[in-house]
């Protein structure tokens, strides 16, 4: 596996961040006393939040750091697979449509942050790892790479 690069879908392989994101949106709406109606697409939602709340990312970071343990837990089999791949020379990147702050906190709580070289959008991860990076969208796909 030396020379292999993998681009892992955070939500499909390591940790589903959607419940944490949805809880934060609900909490933020309550705190600012404004009904935050944001698109389901998180990239579009970020733009809407920029307009509605201004500097909302620190609020998300604090909330996610505090609440992530409620939704995100390490998966021993997945983490063992990642450790084995990295030990064999595989480069690992993680992509998500979640804001980077949320993605990095999710990775830490999933126990996978040390194995990951780059976090970002799929385009950013592919640029960092090289265009030949194999996209992995599920734990089953990851298990098949062993």
Where are these regions (language model features)?
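Asp-based, Mg2+/Mn2+-dependent phosphohydrolase catalytic module
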Residues: 1-2, 86, 100, 104-146
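N-terminal helical cap/lid subdomain that shapes the substrate entry/recognition surface
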Residues: 2-76, 101-104
